[in-house]
Swiss-Prot record:
It comes from the Eukaryota. Induction: Expressed under acidic conditions and repressed by the processed, active form of RIM101 under alkaline conditions. Residues 214-258, 460-542 are annotated as: Disordered. It comes from Saccharomyces cerevisiae (strain ATCC 204508 / S288c). This is pH-response regulator protein palF/RIM8. One of its GO terms (molecular function) is protein-macromolecule adaptor activity.
Length: 542
């Protein structure tokens, strides 16, 4: 008897069915006892990333166990923003807001309009009156809904503290519930991805950012000069009485000038915005007052800053930092010019998302390029795995021959044909680190370390292809001599290959059966010629 009661209790409770990632819930009305067998949304292109002003086509499929009457099927396009706020994991609050909701009826639209008549006081349909119905079995309702466009549209995104989600929601409602006071009888959802294009070609060109460093003695000298200028009116009144004293002080000041200890750091970026997947060229120039060398003196990092708003007005905003990629280069101040110029590269990874600032009350994402300059040889730069960056030259000899071979091959390719590396970013990406990077926050705390931060915009499109260096450095940035094939052969040949004209070089035919790598054929050919030249000439008198 108790088992029968338990069975009746379970049959009365509302049920939830999860099928193909879609959840359908059914209430205790005319569709109770699980009368809907399956309810789902099929999209014609389920894996496509949609853009605003594009139309999504598909069909809503519902499988019913028995005949039902007086129902309507509504399809809605919804954009929902979710964010988790709170410092501790146990006290996280969720904020949910729908920024977009566009609805249309797939079935029963005419009866819904009749029930919502303005003259009718009670929008109620009698249960005995049959307006429409669906028979037992599977029913398919095709649809075509357009994604709106405008300034309020957002790109789909999911991260640890929040998300922007687009989904299609299809509900099966009773005509008695057209006022929305009760929950829908059945519901299913289907998510899809939307990306809002962000054009970076129309952004203004950024100005060169400069940082000037001066010694403490020079700063104190400037303060003294400013105080002297403020008291110039008083000194003019007493100029006649203190002529001798002022002249002697001026002579002393001229004889002991302070040394000019000024360091100027200039950073220039060709554009203010870059696309996802592009390489960012950064020009760095340093004017120093003395020769200087640091093996890990220049650290450039692409940083993403995420700001998450609080649940209330009084709650503080949380800030999270994420280092995307990093490049480390040495600094060498030329003793003659006392200058250093270099171009470093960073890359926007393909899995990055564009800059987002329109959802400021929830969260925002901004990108910055941080350039840190280490002006001290005593500072040791460590990575996250405690690996030292900038080891001496003597310690680098034991790293293996593979890195040296790769560098030689790249140099040879650039000399033979510079275009081979122009479209291949492997040569530039080899100096970009995506893991085991230097902690920039710790680097800032060291002495004689300075830098700057430049905001950049990460977008998705570039309508105007500009001539400046944007994604990949141009051919002019690669300093390679334009050698003709004959000059290149002369350069590759040994010095004594064509000196002796007495001994003729015999002809030979290469063996096609032997598989030799293409890059080593010329080298093997030269060795063979040298061996043949070193053999003694044949003697006919023997």
């Amino acid at each position: 008897m108790s088992l029968l009661r338990l069975w009746n209790k379970e049959s009365r409770a509302p049920s939830k069915i999860k099928s193909h990632g879609i959840v359908g819930s059914y209430g205790n009305s005319m569709l109770a006892h699980n009368n809907v067998k399956q309810f789902r949304i099929d999209i014609d292109e389920p894996h496509r990333v949609w853009k605003p002003n594009e139309s999504i086509t598909g069909e809503a499929v519902i499988d019913i166990k028995r005949d039902i009457t007086n129902v309507a099927i509504k399809l809605s396009l919804v954009c929902e923003v979710r964010v988790k706020t709170g410092n501790s994991p146990t006290s996280k609050n969720k904020r949910i807001e729908k920024t977009l909701e566009k609805s249309t009826f797939l079935y029963g639209q005419d009866y819904v309009k009749t029930a919502f008549s303005a003259k009718e006081k009670k929008p109620h349909v009698d249960k005995t009156t049959i307006l429409n119905g669906l028979s037992k079995g599977e029913h398919r309702f095709p649809f075509r809904i357009r994604i709106p466009r405008g300034r309020g549209m957002l790109s789909s995104i999911k991260f640890e503290r929040g998300s922007i989600t687009y989904f299609l929601s299809c509900t099966l409602e009773s005509l008695n519930n057209i006022n929305g006071l009760k929950k829908p009888e059945a519901r299913c959802e289907r998510e899809f991805a939307v990306i809002v294009p962000l054009d970076v070609s129309r952004l203004p060109k950024p100005k060169t950012k400069t940082v000037v460093l001066q010694s403490a003695s020079m700063v104190q000298n400037k303060k003294n000069k400013s105080t002297e200028d403020e008291s110039s009116s008083y000194t003019q009144l007493t100029q006649k009485s203190t002529t001798s004293n002022s002249s002697s002080s001026s002579v002393n000041s001229k004889t002991s000038p302070l040394p000019n200890k000024t360091v100027t750091i200039s950073v220039d970026i060709p554009q203010a915005g870059f696309m996802i997947g592009e390489i960012i060229p950064i020009d760095v120039k340093i004017d120093h007052y003395k020769p200087f060398y640091a093996p890990a003196g220049l650290t450039t990092t692409l940083v993403r800053i995420c700001r998450v708003g609080g649940a209330g007005k009084d709650d503080p905003m949380e800030t999270f930092r994420k280092d995307i990629c990093q490049s480390i280069s040495p600094i060498y101040i030329n003793p003659e010019t006392l200058q250093f110029q270099s171009r470093v590269y960073l890359k926007v990874p393909l899995d990055a998302f564009s800059t987002l600032t329109t959802v400021g009350k929830f969260f925002s994402f901004q990108y910055y390029i941080e350039v840190m300059v280490n002006l001290s040889k005593k500072n040791v730069v460590y990575t996250e795995s405690n690996r030292i960056i900038g080891t001496p030259i003597g310690e680098q000899n034991g790293l293996g021959v593979e890195n040296n071979i790769n560098r030689i091959q790249r140099k040879m390719l650039r000399m033979v044909n510079p275009e081979t590396l122009e479209n291949d970013s492997e040569g530039y990406e080899s100096s970009i680190f995506f893991k085991d990077m230097v902690n920039v926050e710790k680097l800032k705390r060291l002495r004689n370390v300075t830098g700057m931060s430049i905001e950049t915009v990460i977008g998705t499109t570039r309508s105007e292809q500009q001539q400046s260096d944007a994604s990949i450095p141009s051919q002019s940035s690669i300093t390679a001599p334009q050698n003709s094939p004959s000059n290149l052969r002369d350069w590759l040949a040994p010095l004594n290959a064509y000196d002796s004209d007495d001994v003729p070089v015999p002809k030979y035919s290469p063996n096609d059966k032997v598989s030799v790598p293409s890059e080593d054929k010329q080298e093997l050919e030269q060795k063979r010629l040298q061996q043949l030249e070193s053999d003694p000439p044949p003697c006919d008198d023997y």
